[in-house]
Amino acid sequence: MPKMKNNKGAAKRFKKTAGGIKYKHATKRHILTKRTTKNKRQLRPNAILPKCELAAVARMLPYA
């Protein structure tokens, strides 16, 4: 039986850790002048994926 393939887009965006699957927040790349300092600071740390999304990401990353 052939090996299953990872979804390459998901592999670049998500990382499996002991605490769950972590990812970076969206809307933090460019045109940040309209965002407040508080909002940019809150988007800084990596986030942990919520439970409702775990199954979808697990399907995309079979070996994670």
Curated annotation (Swiss-Prot):
GO terms for molecular function: structural constituent of ribosome. This is Large ribosomal subunit protein bL35. One of its GO terms (cellular component) is cytosolic large ribosomal subunit. It comes from the Bacteria. NCBIfam families: rpmI_bact (TIGR00001). It comes from Vibrio cholerae serotype O1 (strain ATCC 39315 / El Tor Inaba N16961). Belongs to the bacterial ribosomal protein bL35 family. GO terms for biological process: translation. Keywords: Ribonucleoprotein, Ribosomal protein. The keyword Repressor does not apply. The gene is rpmI.
